[in-house]
Structure formats: C-alpha cells, structure tokens
Amino acid sequence: QRQMCIRDRYYATEATRLLESQRATYYLQSAERRFAEEQARIDACLSPNTLAPLKEIVERRLLTEHLDEILAMPDGGLVVLLDTDARADMERMYRLFRLVPTGLDALNKVLRAYVTDRGKIINETTLYESKNTQTPSAEMAMSWVNQVLDTKSRLDGVLATSFQGDKSCEAAINEAMDTFINLNTRAPEFISLYIDEHLRKGTRFADDTTALEPVLDKTITIFRYVHEKDVFERYYKMHLTRRLLHNRSASDDAERSMIAKLKVECGHGYVQKLQGMLNDMKLSEEVLRAFHHTLEREGTSLPLQLNVN
C-alpha cells in the first residue's frame, strides 16, 4: 500500500511537470514510456498482482485527470495534429486515450467541433461569393463540393489509420459532416450542379469516362448527408431536363448510372420521374430514327426537318 501511495504522488508530480511543456506529443510519448517502465518494473521485481493498481494510478494521473488539457495544447493538441495531418501522433493519442473510460468521449468532442468548424469555413467562403446571386455558378458549386470531398477524404484517411476505424470516431465525423453540410442551404443545388458539370457533353469531365464513375460514387457520399433530398430532386430534374433538351448529355449510360446510384440511396419512387424522362427521350430518338429510315427506304425527302425533344 505504501508503494502505491509513493507511485501515486510521483505520477501526480510527473503530470504537473509534463503539462508545463504544453507539448502534447512530448507529453504522450512520456506517458507511453512510463507505462512501459512500470510494466518492466513489475516483470523484474514486483508481484503481478500490483499491475492493475499501478496501471490505474498511471492512467488516472497522466491521462484521465488531464484529457482536456492535453487535447487543447497549442503544440501537438488534436486540432494542430488534424491541421498538419500528423497521423502517427494522432494514432498515439487515440491509443492512449482509449485506455481510460472517458478518453474517447473527450477526443471525439474535439474531433466533432474541429470538423464542424472547418466545414463552416468552407460554407462561409462559398456562400460569401454567391450571396449576391440567386443562381450560383457551376464554379461555386464545384469549389464547395470539391472542398467537402477533400475534407471527407482526409478524415476517412485519419479514421482508417490513426483512429483504427473506431466506430465512435466515425460517428463523430459523420455527425459533424451532417451538421455543416446542412447548414449550407444551397447544398442540394450545389451537389446537383456538380453532377451536371460532370454529365454535360463537352466538359473535360464527361470526356473522361473512366474517371467519371469514381467521381459520381464520391458525390453520393456527400449526397447521403443532405436532409432536403426533395430539394435536390427538384434541381436534379431541372438540370437533367436542360441536358436532354439541349442535347448536352454526355451519354445515356452515364445518366442511368447516376440515377441507379440515387435509386440505391432513396428507392425507386425517388427516381421514377427521372427514369421516365430518360425513357421518353430514348423512345423519341428511336421513333425519329425509324421515321428517317422509312423515308430513306421509300426515297422520300422532306422540304423541312425539325427535331422536337
């Protein structure tokens, strides 16, 4: 018991000393060494029965009592690590915080706030550019969606490597993404414009068919967060109509592929009208081709030709 009291006082003092450095990475590296040293001491000369109480002392004094302070440190705190994509340091932080009951709750609180704040910056920058126009440009939509996709891609990487795919961390990221995406009232329109820019004939995106499918898949990952899917449908229908009427659709296959993705997310009823528009256009083209074929076979020519879609 006396030995435990000595170790308890030692680690309380050690925590105070380490906190003065205000360097989270140094703090956690030191904590990691202390865990290893206690394990080696027990293996060498102490009873295995002392492992649990000693472990509790080190975890409580070095971690549990200072979680928020460690996370908020200006050098190596979680926000700094996320900004600099310091994945090894984040992995150490996750691994140690996971040892104590409230560790991941504290980490996820900061993670959630970080993602929300960075998302708000994306929103504010884009919405400031579009505030004086009722119809945002494709460039604005592309900028917003690309920034959101880049953010999600980076966070997915952090989740997989640093946070070991932890479900609670994934939930924190998703909650924050959901929050800031839906704070942008133009998100449904931006996503539809982004898709339109990729499916329109003549754009640099539509001409590269091998790269198109992965882009559409990534777009769906953002679409999932949108609450106002009826608003998105309205814009998507308008943009699809414009592509079809102006003969600007890159390909029927690409259009149907995108609609199939929306169907998986929202069901048949959601895409029924969109599928109907494509089917009507295809039928119109087939009837027109058959008509011209008949004219050619009969050697008949018309003084005036019109294409009506």
Tell me the role of every PLM-derived stretch.
Residues Q1-Q3, D8-N309:
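Eukaryotic scaffold/interaction segments
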